[in-house]
A protein has these predicted regions:
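Ribonuclease/tRNase effector modules and their secretory precursors
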Residues: 1-83
Length: 83
């Protein structure tokens, strides 16, 4: 389990071919910004290998981001939306 208080992502991955973020009018850049704000992380109940991050973009937009944590702190963003 990651220590979320000291978590610093090494890199980000995203499937631009499926682009589930755009369906919610969220850009990949906005999703990444949320990882560098004050954030809260919970386990995703539906998928045990995924997490939910609630954070803010530089512009102040509050988003929920669904992601997987891969080896070496690589974050695979699945989707996200406004909350």
């Amino acid at each position: 389990m990651a220590n979320w208080n000291r978590f610093l992502p090494k890199d980000f991955e995203y499937d631009f071919d499926q682009d589930k973020l755009s369906a919610h009018r969220v850009s990949f850049e906005e999703a990444v910004e949320c990882f560098f704000s004050d954030f809260e992380i919970r386990r995703n109940k539906a998928y045990k290998d995924r997490y939910q991050l609630i954070g803010k973009t530089i512009g102040g937009r509050k988003l929920k981001i669904i992601f997987q944590l891969k080896p070496d702190n690589v974050v695979r963003i699945i989707t996200g939306w406004d909350i």
